[in-house]
Every structure is written in structure tokens, then in C-alpha cells.
């Protein structure tokens, strides 16, 4: 309970407010897979304890492979899942995958993996659910409180903010787009950088109107895309091959709820592959584009753990 969180702006500012909200357990690192599975199990508990709706849709998830190497990797990941106790998944053929996601073309696919504990949620609702549950347990959070400096003492830290000074034993850097600057306040250089990331939301798709179930979260490893249902349309996200860094030294302090103009030329190849994988997209319009910033480490996983000497 002796914990407080400082938010420079308002909860969700930066990346959380515009995130696509996909949840999944598949990860190249089995430790991360186990952590992600634990988080998914925790979500209903957080929702119940906070009383905050998180918009949880447990649709299940497909991850599809179209080259021998990726198909072998998926089969290996499946075996790792079994070894660490994630048993609610199975390998599927392209035909089985098409039954699970009827708007997906299986041309060129060799197989995939189905996982029960995948889907998506409302990121804004989830952030507020965590905050409410934490406050119920005695923790606190303060919005509109900017960290300006960190001073290490023999007993811990002095956190200098624009509202005053907080003394504590430990500081956790959860700065997101501002993690680089927070790290430098503690005298460390973190290998993180904000990148621009696209997704689109389509207009209504007729095939989805006729289904009595929600299509699963689907990742196409060959097309560098992920897809989930959004009402009676879909959200198609792009893993940019030609990625673009932004604000390499950390986002401006006054950045918070902004987006960038979409850059369709930069993601043209992925868009073509996505529209071929989901042909229904070729017949509908695009309702919304989102091009927002997220902070990434070199391997895409979070930086977690103590800093030596700090």
C-alpha cells in the first residue's frame, strides 16, 4: 500500500489511449509468455475489484505461418507452451483456421496456432481499472504531476516534482514515451526509442454482420499484420517493416493525446499483404486511421529489473 504513481498529464496519456488493445500469450521468450498469461488471468479480477468495465473480449487468437521456418517456430512455441503449463492452445491446419476466421484467405499458409486466452480489451478502461483497484488497496496516484529530477540518497531517492518532493526507497521507471528522460535523471541510458505505429479501422463488413460469433484476434506472420473485430468492421494493425523513429531522446513533455498523419506510402507493402489476406477489406472503406507513438526496446520486450548501483 505504500506506493504512489506520478502521471505528468492524465491517465492513458502518451500511448495507452490509442493502443489497439490486443492481448495474447505468444512470445519468443517463454518467460514473457508466462508473464503475459498471468496478466490475462488477472484481468477479470482487476475488473471485478475496481468495478470498472475493461471491455474484455476473449475471442481466442490465431497466429499463422506461411514459410517452413516460421511454421517450425510456431510448432516449437507450441511445445514450449505445453512445458510451461499453457495448455489451452493447439496447432491448426489452414482449413481449420479458415473456419475460425471466415474472412481470412489461407493462400500460402502452412498452418497456425490457436490459443483460447487471446482477444482484446478497452485500453482506457483497463488503465482506470488498475488505478481504481490500486487505490482501493491503499496505493495512490497523482495526475498533472511532472517529475523534474531524481536525487539518490543513502536511503533511497528524492523525487523532485513540480508539486513538491517525495522521498522513497525505490523508483520504478514506467515513463513510456518519456522513459529515456526519466532514465537520464537517474544517470542511466536506456536502450528505448519511440516508434510510429499504424492501424486502421474499417467500415462495416457484410460477412461479419452474418456471423453469430466474433472473429478471433489473428496475427499473420508473413504479412506483418494483426487483425481483430471492431463492432461489425475490423481493426488491421501493421508491424512496420520500414519503421520510423520519433523523438529519439524522448517525447516532448507537452505531448499527450496527439496522433500523426497516416503514412500510407511507408506501409504500402504491408497494406497490400493485409488486404490480400483479408479480401473483404477491398470492398469497404476505411473509417479511421491511427498513427501513434509507442516506446520499444531493441527486442520488443519490456526492460524489467533492477539497475545495478541504483
Question: Where do the language-model regions lie?
Answer:
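Glycine-rich FAD pyrophosphate-binding loop
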Residues: 1-17
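Flavin-dependent oxidoreductases
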Residues: 24, 46, 150-262, 269-282
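C-terminal catalytic lobe of FAD-dependent flavoproteins
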Residues: 123, 222, 258-310
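Dinucleotide-binding Rossmann-like beta1-alpha1 core, especially the glycine-rich loop
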Residues: 21-100, 222-227, 232-233, 261
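Helical element adjacent to the flavin cofactor pocket in flavoenzyme catalytic cores
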Residues: 113-170, 178
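Short Gly/Ser/Thr- and Asp/Glu-enriched loop/turn motifs at secondary-structure junctions
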Residues: 57-61, 195-196, 289-291
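Short beta-strand to alpha-helix junction loop
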Residues: 34-37, 64-73, 113-136, 142, ...
Amino acid at each position: 500500500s505504500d506506493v504512489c504513481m506520478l502521471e505528468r498529464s492524465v491517465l492513458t496519456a502518451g500511448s495507452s489511449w490509442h493502443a489497439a488493445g490486443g492481448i495474447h500469450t505468444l512470445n519468443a521468450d517463454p518467460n514473457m509468455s508466462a508473464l503475459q498469461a498471468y496478466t490475462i488471468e488477472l484481468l477479470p479480477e482487476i475488473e471485478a475489484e475496481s468495478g470498472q468495465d475493461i471491455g474484455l473480449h476473449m475471442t481466442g487468437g490465431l497466429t499463422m505461418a506461411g514459410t517452413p521456418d516460421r511454421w517450425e517456430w510456431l510448432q516449437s512455441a507450441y511445445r514450449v507452451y505445453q512445458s510451461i503449463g499453457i495448455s489451452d492452445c493447439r496447432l491448426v491446419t489452414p482449413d481449420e483456421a479458415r473456419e475460425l476466421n471466415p474472412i481470412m484467405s489461407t493462400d500460402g499458409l502452412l498452418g497456425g496456432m490457436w490459443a483460447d486466452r487471446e482477444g482484446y480489451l478497452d485500453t482506457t478502461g483497463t488503465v482506470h481499472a488498475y488505478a481504481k483497484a490500486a487505490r482501493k488497496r491503499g496505493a495512490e496516484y497523482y495526475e498533472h504531476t511532472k517529475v523534474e529530477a531524481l536525487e539518490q540518497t543513502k536511503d533511497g531517492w528524492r523525487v523532485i516534482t513540480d508539486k513538491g518532493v517525495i522521498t522513497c526507497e525505490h523508483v520504478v521507471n514506467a515513463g513510456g514515451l518519456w522513459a529515456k528522460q526519466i532514465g537520464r535523471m537517474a544517470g542511466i541510458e536506456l536502450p528505448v526509442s519511440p516508434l510510429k505505429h499504424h492501424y486502421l479501422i474499417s467500415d462495416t463488413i457484410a460477412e461479419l454482420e452474418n456471423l453469430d460469433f466474433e472473429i478471433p484476434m489473428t496475427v499473420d506472420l508473413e504479412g506483418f499484420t494483426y487483425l481483430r473485430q471492431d463492432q461489425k468492421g475490423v481493426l488491421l494493425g501493421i508491424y512496420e517493416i520500414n519503421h520510423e523513429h520519433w523523438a529519439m531522446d524522448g517525447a516532448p513533455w507537452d505531448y499527450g493525446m496527439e496522433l500523426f498523419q497516416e503514412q500510407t506510402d511507408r506501409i504500402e507493402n504491408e497494406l497490400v499483404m493485409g488486404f490480400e489476406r483479408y479480401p473483404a477489406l477491398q470492398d469497404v472503406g476505411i473509417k479511421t486511421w491511427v498513427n501513434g507513438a509507442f516506446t520499444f526496446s531493441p527486442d520488443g520486450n519490456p526492460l524489467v529489473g533492477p539497475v545495478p548501483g541504483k
